[in-house]
Amino acid sequence: MRNQLSILDVPVDVITMKEAVQRVQNLYSEPGLHTVVTVNAEMVMRARHDKELHQILKQADMAVPDGAGVLWAAEQLGQHIPERVAGCDLAVALLQEASQHKTPVYFFGAEPGVAEQAVKNMEALIGPLQVVGIHSGFFDEQEEVNIIKAIEDGGAKLVLVALGVPKPVSYTHLRA
């Protein structure tokens, strides 16, 4: 059972980094696609006026507290989140686990060349990764079909999406 709180009707998991990594690893064995979002104050405020984003955040499999503003808001509501789970830190922790367990990873998003450099940087930091694909965040509708096929055909268990809010959230939700 998930322990969540609500900030302006946006669910946020009360979770530590260690628990978040474990939860993602558990999601690998569950059928279907899963969405993990990193909730910060900007997303909470945007969701107040963007019904699509609001629905996506509410339906995510995990919504980690990414930002001091989220922790502060929880305290103002008389609730406590044990720690900030920043998206970039979560990505590093998940990639460390992926390196150890040879989990297939797909890097998706950012400007051309950025994801490739991210792979090099991460491998220098944590060791070899089983990268099954890389694609920048610039694509048309036909390429989108090919990207989805590459992710599926490559058997990626972890897809890191860096497209900027609200595009990555919308993208991962629509493809789930």
Regions found by a protein language model. Give the residues of each.
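Conserved acidic residues
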Residues: 61, 132, 157
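Periplasmic-binding protein-like
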Residues: 157-165
